């Protein structure tokens, strides 16, 4: 398949993601009793900026990169969301993910709307200096629409605390004063928060703990399969192993490892490279598709979207599915899993730990007072447990599935703020 065809396929997939997000938002607002005008406001971002960023490469040439920043709804407060560096970034994906950030912030009851950014690039082929120049160029290009009270970026796919540090420094230079609250996910010495690196995995862990209670399963010795061994997947494997659960399957882009008696998680974590790859060290590797259908109690898709579909949903043997990735389960597959009695914890709830601790970082920056790792963990647990219970009860009260209940919970805050402002 050609690179051009891959690009077209990615654009089509992103459009489907955007349209499916709109479909569920429409139903959520209808269930909550809002008029059609509210959906017209919420179905698209308020603001979508496309920028062109010229970067001098190490060989002396100048390459122009395309970047995006989407701000979905700022009725509640500033928008918030990550910046991803990836060759498959496109406008529809960024728009959809900014809507998801509105939902995540609403679920966690944070004073934010949703934002998202991205640059079409392959950071794996770029030098340290090229990445720095690209990061600073992006901030210069979007500087008029971002800031601590406007829109607060954060790390995402292939971006990290170093890139956040460059971006914070560039923004501070432009404003001529230090502005750590402009961005989150920074190094600790530049105003980062304890617990930020593990926040997403901690949030998923808490959701698993709450889900097993609902299903009457003991976490100790529960059999868990984790698809994806990046930041969230690897930390989750560690947390589950430490909690006494039996991690029987993990995977990366190369394939999966499966052992019904349990994998040696400390060994795999030690051998994992910076891109989350470890299965290339083994010969007995199965496909990601095969791994998803293995017998287990808890399945955690923590890799990419559209992994559980109508084609394989009937073969999923887990009684609990917790979505640590964005959009790993299609709408059709969600219906099948619900009909089969599988408890599905949706992505916008399960992965809300990251933005929650980003909010804590922003609060600490504004106060100039910093919390211990234990304080951050305690506050995160309080938010995640409350969010899980609210969505679980919403699903029971309205007789809807957990995904629709999560959308209802997530969109309500921005919808109410928009109504009070007189926008609808």
Curated annotation (Swiss-Prot):
Q: Which positions in this protein are listed as binding NAD(+)?
A: 200, 231
Inducing stimuli: Enzyme activity is low in early exponential phase and reached higher levels in the middle and late stages of exponential growth (at protein level). Repressed by glucose; induced by arginine, ornithine, or to a lesser extent proline (in the absence of glucose). Not induced by glutamate or glutamine. Expression depends on the alternative sigma-L factor and the transcription factor RocR. Subject to direct CcpA-dependent glucose repression.
Q: Which UniProt keywords apply?
A: NAD, Oxidoreductase
Q: What is this protein called?
A: Catabolic NAD-specific glutamate dehydrogenase RocG
User: Which domain of life, per UniProt?
Assistant: Bacteria
Q: How does activity depend on pH?
A: Optimum pH is 7.7 and 7.3 for L-glutamate deamination and 2-oxoglutarate amination, respectively. Half-maximal activity for deamination is observed at pH 6.9 and 7.8 and that for amination is at pH 6.9 and 7.8.
Name the family.
Belongs to the Glu/Leu/Phe/Val dehydrogenases family.
User: Which N-terminal stretch is annotated as signal sequence?
Assistant: none
Q: Which SMART domains match?
A: ELFV_dehydrog
Q: What is the effect of changing residue 93 to K?
A: Reduces the affinity for glutamate and ammonium
Q: What's one GO BP annotation on this UniProt entry?
A: amino acid metabolic process
Characterize activity with respect to temperature.
Answer: Low thermostability at 41 degrees Celsius due to the dissociation of the hexamer.
Q: How does it assemble?
A: Homohexamer. Interacts with transcriptional regulator GltC.
Q: What is the effect of changing residue 144 to R?
A: Increase of thermostability 20 degrees Celsius higher than that of the wild-type
- Select a single GO molecular function from the record's annotations and give it: glutamate dehydrogenase (NAD+) activity
Q: Which residues are tagged with the site Important for catalysis?
A: 156
Residues annotated as catalytic: 116 (proton donor)
The residues listed in the UniProt record as binding substrate, with positions renumbered to this chain, are 80, 104, 358
Q: What does this protein do?
A: Devoted to catabolic function of glutamate (and other amino acids of the glutamate family) utilization as sole nitrogen source. It is not involved in anabolic function of glutamate biosynthesis since B.subtilis possesses only one route of glutamate biosynthesis from ammonia, catalyzed by glutamate synthase. Wild-type cells are unable to utilize glutamate or glutamine as a sole carbon source; thus RocG does not function physiologically to synthesize glutamate, but it is involved in the utilization of arginine, and proline as carbon or nitrogen source.
Q: Which CDD domains match?
A: NAD_bind_1_Glu_DH (cd01076)
Q: What is the lineage of its organism?
A: Bacteria, Bacillati, Bacillota, Bacilli, Bacillales
């Amino acid at each position: 398949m050609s690179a051009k065809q891959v690009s077209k396929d990615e654009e089509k997939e992103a459009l489907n993601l955007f349209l499916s997000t709109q479909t569920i938002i429409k139903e959520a607002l209808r269930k909550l009793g809002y008029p059609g005008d509210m959906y017209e406001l919420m179905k698209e971002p308020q603001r979508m900026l496309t920028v062109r960023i010229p970067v001098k490469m190490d060989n002396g040439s100048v390459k122009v990169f395309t970047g995006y920043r989407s701000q979905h709804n700022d009725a509640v407060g500033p928008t918030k969301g990550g910046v991803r560096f990836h060759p498959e970034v496109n406008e529809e994906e960024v728009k959809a993910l900014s809507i998801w950030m509105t939902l995540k912030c609403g679920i966690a009851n944070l004073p934010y709307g949703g934002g998202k950014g991205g640059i079409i690039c392959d950071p794996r082929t770029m030098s340290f200096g090229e990445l720095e120049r690209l990061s600073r160029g992006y901030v210069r290009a979007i500087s008029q629409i971002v800031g601590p009270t406007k829109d607060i970026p954060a790390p995402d796919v292939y971006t990290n605390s170093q890139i956040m540090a460059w971006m914070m420094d560039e923004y501070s230079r432009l404003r001529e004063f230090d502005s750590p609250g402009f961005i989150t996910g920074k190094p600790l010495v530049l105003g980062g928060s304890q617990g930020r690196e593990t926040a997403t995995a901690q949030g998923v862990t808490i959701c698993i703990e709450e889900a097993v209670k609902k299903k009457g399963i003991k976490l100790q010795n529960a059999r868990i399969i984790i698809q994806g061994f990046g930041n969230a997947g690897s930390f989750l494997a560690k947390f589950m192993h430490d909690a006494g659960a039996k991690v029987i399957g993990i995977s990366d882009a190369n394939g999966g490892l499966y052992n019904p008696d349990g994998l040696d998680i400390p060994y795999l974590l030690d051998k994992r490279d910076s891109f989350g790859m470890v299965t290339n060290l083994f010969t007995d590797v199965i496909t990601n598709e095969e791994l998803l259908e293995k017998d287990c109690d808890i399945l955690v898709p923590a890799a990419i979207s559209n992994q559980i579909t109508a084609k394989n949903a009937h073969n999923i043997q887990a009684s609990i599915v917790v979505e640590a990735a964005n959009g790993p389960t299609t709408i059709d597959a969600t219906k099948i899993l619900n009909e089969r009695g599988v408890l599905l914890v949706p992505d916008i709830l399960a992965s809300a730990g990251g933005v929650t601790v980003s909010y804590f970082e922003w609060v600490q920056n504004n106060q100039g007072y910093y919390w211990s790792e234990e304080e951050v963990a305690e506050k995160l647990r309080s938010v995640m447990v409350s969010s899980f219970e609210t969505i679980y009860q919403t699903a029971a009260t309205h007789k809807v599935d957990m995904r629709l209940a999560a959308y209802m919970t997530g969109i309500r805050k921005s919808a109410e703020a928009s109504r009070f402002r007189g926008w609808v």
